[in-house]
Amino acid sequence: MGPPEGIAIVSASLSPLASFGLRRGKEHQGGSCHDGRMSRVTCDLTVSLDGFVAGPNQRAEEPLGDGGELLHRWMFEDPEANAPEIEGILAAGAFIMGRNMFAGPGPSVWDKGWRGWWGDEPPYHAPVFVLTHHQHEPLEMEGGTSFHFVTDGIESALARAREAAGDRDVAIAGGAQTARQFLSAGLMDELRLHIAPMILGGGERLLDGVGDVKLEQAEVRGTGLVTHVRYLVVR
């Protein structure tokens, strides 16, 4: 079975959410309303049973490391059973990602005209704010995606993403380091873990070093290839 309509896997670095290649269909363009409240900050990540979001030996050819792509079987082999979670991933009105997710592991390739992993029409169809230490002009892509490069920290990126998202959610798209930064800083409202029944044995862990973060389990749902656990961040 192929990927669900509106979803395309991409070769993006470090975060399993990056590999989802979030592709939002036309039915999502209107957004959703949160009754006038400030948009939530969410993060969807697939992890192995031993807590890794990517396997060992991450490299340009295998940005999710050895075995990392297998984490995401649930999206592409059983999309119908996992439709609510896929819908949740697609709902964001703006995204934030780290430099490694945009450019991949290893030396920067921006000076070579790099425009991301996703071709001329990236799958986000919304503004994407890329955290970096290097100045870069915005990139306007086909299909509504635009990349904006933020050099003054996660708070600035979040403020800009909230403004762009309006009443829709802001999604932390990855990678793992970026997710940890937002979680540790108390800037995340929901952490949605998709736990794959596999052991990677090494690679990049998600939660190492996040500090004293309190989570409240809000929902658990299993579909065979994955167990979805939604946590609220308690402040």
Model regions and ranges:
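Low-acidity, Ser/Thr- and Arg-rich intrinsically disordered low-complexity segments
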Residues: 11-15
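Extreme N-terminal basic, low-complexity initiation segments
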Residues: 1-10
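Enzymes that bind and transform nitrogen-containing heteroaromatic metabolites
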Residues: 24, 28-235
